[in-house]
Curated annotation (Swiss-Prot):
It comes from Drosophila melanogaster (Fruit fly). Belongs to the VPS25 family. One of its GO terms (molecular function) is structural molecule activity. Keywords: Cytoplasm, Endosome, Membrane, Protein transport, Transport. One of its GO terms (biological process) is autophagosome maturation. It is found in: Cytoplasm; Endosome membrane. It comes from the Eukaryota. This is Vacuolar protein-sorting-associated protein 25. Pfam families: ESCRT-II.
């Protein structure tokens, strides 16, 4: 895996402090949300813990700067508003983060199903997320919990039906 390319802002000490000026803060949060999504995709991660203060995402060792939990929550709040994250606990300490929104994941999967003629067939979540037929697609490698959430949205729209057997999930597309 290639080394992650940090944006120039990552080497700018004030970037690690929540900015008081509204316009500056909004720009700062936009850069941070983009950085979170790119970094998590690069590292193939879908969950974040606010307590993970040693992650390079939260801590620039060279600058000796670290994101405050307040700033991390502000960033995750922005990701939540844009449909790219959801808290996994009531204390909002553990988060599931999506490289694409759940709706985008659902649409990508449904487009693939239609393009490959798999309507009215049953697929396993493994086939969709990790199968050789999807290795070239943006949703390849998606976390099963994220995929399941995206498929639930498709199910609400009547495009599929989730099937659970012995703790495993399958899905039939319409």
């Amino acid at each position: 895996m290639a080394e992650f390319q940090w944006p120039w802002e990552y080497t700018f000490p004030p970037f690690f402090t929540l900015q008081p000026h509204e316009e500056t803060r909004q720009q700062q949060l936009k850069v941070w949300t983009d950085l979170f999504l790119k970094y998590l995709r690069h590292t193939n991660r879908f969950t974040l813990s606010i307590g993970d203060q040693n992650s390079p995402l939260f801590h620039n060792e060279a600058l000796k700067r670290r994101l405050s939990p307040e700033l991390v929550l502000a960033i995750l709040g922005e990701l939540e508003r844009s449909g790219h994250a959801n808290p996994l606990d009531k204390r909002r300490q553990e988060w599931q983060v999506y490289w694409f929104t759940l709706e985008e994941y659902g649409n990508m999967v449904y487009d693939w199903v239609q393009e490959t003629g798999q309507t009215n067939t049953i697929c396993t979540l493994y086939e969709i997320a990790s199968g050789e037929n999807t290795s070239h697609l943006d949703f390849y490698g998606v976390d099963e919990a994220v995929l399941l959430s995206a498929l639930r949205l498709l199910e609400e729209k009547g495009r599929c039906e989730l099937i659970e057997m012995d703790g495993s999930h399958g899905v039939k597309f319409f």
